């Protein structure tokens, strides 16, 4: 779990450096799954950073938009930083595809009222960044 310590240190530095930067807790279930992935530590950091950023977007409102938008942008920047040192092209393509897919699903989710369909979409969104790496297999698309 060195990766988790690494990202927590980075976020603590950002919090002390930028007063508007806000942290939200990492998703405990996602952390547990990331722990078991057979990928580089930086890829694990990237997954946690982008997962947290995308979840944080769901909490943005008029009262917190200044700090939360900044925070999601900073977390997204960390995502790109972790994937660039060294450059993990395959993981970059897989995970940026996941970001696009989550944005599509969130748009679809806004139009759905059926509870079962909403549950299924929320489940897909929740596991999106982990799914490509489950069972030590990299899956590029969700078609």
Curated annotation (Swiss-Prot):
Q: Which domain of life is it from?
A: Bacteria
* Top EC class of this enzyme: transferase
**An annotated GO BP:** menaquinone biosynthetic process
Spell out the protein name for this chain: Hexaprenyl-diphosphate synthase small subunit ((2E,6E)-farnesyl-diphosphate specific)
| Transmembrane region(s) | none
Q: What's this protein's function?
A: Catalyzes the condensation of three molecules of isopentenyl diphosphate with farnesyl diphosphate (FPP) to yield (all-E)-hexaprenyl diphosphate (HexPP; C30), the precursor of the prenyl side chain of menaquinone-6. Large subunit Hexs-B catalyzes the condensation reaction and the final product chain length is cooperatively regulated by both the Hexs-A and Hexs-B subunits using the whole size of the hydrophobic cleft as a ruler.
Instruction: Enumerate the catalysed reactions.
Output: 3 isopentenyl diphosphate + (2E,6E)-farnesyl diphosphate = all-trans-hexaprenyl diphosphate + 3 diphosphate
Does Coiled coil appear among the keywords?
Answer: no
Gene3D superfamilies, sorted: 1.20.120.1450
State the oligomer form and interacting partners. Answer: Dimer of heterodimer or heterotetramer composed of a small (Hexs-a) and large (Hexs-B) subunit.
Enzyme Commission number(s): 2.5.1.83
Q: NCBIfam families annotated for this entry? A: HxpDPsynsmall
Q: One of this protein's Pfam families, by short name?
A: HexPS-like
User: Which keywords does the record carry?
Assistant: Menaquinone biosynthesis, Transferase
Task: Determine if Transferase is one of this entry's keywords.
Answer: yes
| GO MF entries | hexaprenyl-diphosphate synthase ((2E,6E)-farnesyl-diphosphate specific) activity; magnesium ion binding; transferase activity, transferring alkyl or aryl (other than methyl) groups
């Amino acid at each position: 779990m060195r990766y988790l310590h690494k990202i927590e240190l980075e976020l603590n530095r950002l919090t002390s450096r930028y007063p508007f930067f806000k942290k939200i807790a990492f998703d405990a279930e996602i952390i547990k799954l990331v722990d078991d992935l057979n990928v580089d530590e930086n890829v694990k950091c990237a997954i946690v950073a982008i997962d947290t950023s995308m979840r944080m977007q769901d909490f943005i409102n008029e009262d917190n938009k200044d700090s939360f938008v900044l925070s999601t942008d900073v977390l997204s920047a960390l995502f790109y930083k972790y994937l660039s040192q060294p450059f993990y092209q395959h993981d970059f393509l897989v995970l940026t595809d996941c970001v696009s897919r989550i944005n599509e699903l969130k748009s679809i989710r806004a139009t759905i009222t059926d509870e079962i369909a909403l549950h299924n979409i929320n489940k897909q969104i929740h596991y999106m960044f982990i799914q490509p790496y489950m069972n030590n297999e990299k899956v590029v698309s969700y078609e």
